[in-house]
Amino acid sequence: MHCLGLMSGTSADGVDAVLARFDGPPQRPQWSLLRHHHQSYPLELQRQVVAAGQGAPMPAALWLELAEAITEAQAEAALACDPDAKAELIGCHGQTVWHRPPADEARGASWQMLLAPLLAHRLQRPVVHDFRAADLALGGQGAPLVPRADAALLGSTQGWRALLNLGGIANLTLIPPCSGNDRHAAVLGWDCGPANSLIDLGMRQFTNGAQSFDQGGAMAAQGHADELWIQRWLEEEYFQLAPPKSTGRECFGQADLNRRLKQLGGASAADAIATLTAFSAAVVAQDLEHLRQSVGIAPIELITAGGGSQNPVLIDELRRRCRGAQLDASSSLGVPTEAREALVFALLAWWQERGHPGNVPAVTGASREAVLGVRVNPA
């Protein structure tokens, strides 16, 4: 079955689209990635999405216009990726504007903005969306949702494999080996903390909006990281939590950046960006070390994907801090770094069609497995 996956993440830079084909048993599908495409958000739309994700108040009319603009961007990405309309089913994550994990016995909630009936009408094909709702209803975090799909797509290794997505937020998937004592272990996963979110906001601030990200790590390469503050930041509550845990721009947004820049004092732009970049790598390294110390799991591979994979300074910091794991990009496994999450949501849509569960309760904290997503047929 041909499926189209659409993903727009916390970096809010645009929509990644993937056309893929899935066949065979749901738990171990045969798959091929046929096309992928990135559709950039217009700068004003990107600005509005970032502001909404940080709790900026907006009148209802602007919320409606934002939902329409996001949906149209998804449609444009889908049409560009699949001009011949081969896909029989669309899996669309939507744009997260707020994520609230469960806390103090209060139910979690997460809002992925999308007008799914409009998207189904524009594409004249069924759309599966609202993937997080079922897991949240079962008491889970609703995130991360990629681990089960990661294991199905990129499993079968001789040792533990770690998959690291470097979007706005850094999240890890740990896939158990196909042989040995751990072969029956459950897949693991969680959100580590900021990857590009603070770096991108810092670049906008230091360049007065001229640059929205640190292209090629150029700014970070000119600076020196403040290791003392990095170690202090690693002691903060979120980074000491054990999984399941999830987070987003509501925690690591402009207010958080302002606090950290104030703590860095008179640091130059280059030193501040270098520190934020090293910090993003350090939160991942600390989580992997906590995993090793707590349950004895040490991945032999660390496979990166997402926009941060294109930042050589961030990759060098990961390589330096995550010793013992061979670092490589997901492209080495046949999945372009910018296509991984869109491929996951294409698979989740196919699983929804097949009635196959998509969450991992040990990862999200949900009370049981669930088929994820809500299907909307074209009008």
Curated annotation (Swiss-Prot):
InterPro entries: Anhydro_N_Ac-Mur_kinase, ATPase_NBD. It catalyses: 1,6-anhydro-N-acetyl-beta-muramate + ATP + H2O = N-acetyl-D-muramate 6-phosphate + ADP + H(+). Pathway: Amino-sugar metabolism; 1,6-anhydro-N-acetylmuramate degradation; Cell wall biogenesis; peptidoglycan recycling. Gene3D superfamilies: 3.30.420.40. GO terms for molecular function: ATP binding; kinase activity; phosphotransferase activity, alcohol group as acceptor. Transmembrane segments: none annotated. The keyword Transmembrane does not apply. GO terms for biological process: 1,6-anhydro-N-acetyl-beta-muramic acid catabolic process; amino sugar metabolic process; peptidoglycan turnover. Keywords: ATP-binding, Carbohydrate metabolism, Kinase, Nucleotide-binding, Transferase. Its EC number is 2.7.1.170. ATP binds at G9, T10, S11, A12, D13, G14, V15, D16. Catalyzes the specific phosphorylation of 1,6-anhydro-N-acetylmuramic acid (anhMurNAc) with the simultaneous cleavage of the 1,6-anhydro ring, generating MurNAc-6-P. Is required for the utilization of anhMurNAc either imported from the medium or derived from its own cell wall murein, and thus plays a role in cell wall recycling. PANTHER family: ANHYDRO-N-ACETYLMURAMIC ACID KINASE (PTHR30605:SF0). Belongs to the anhydro-N-acetylmuramic acid kinase family. This is Anhydro-N-acetylmuramic acid kinase. It comes from Synechococcus sp. (strain CC9605). The gene is anmK.
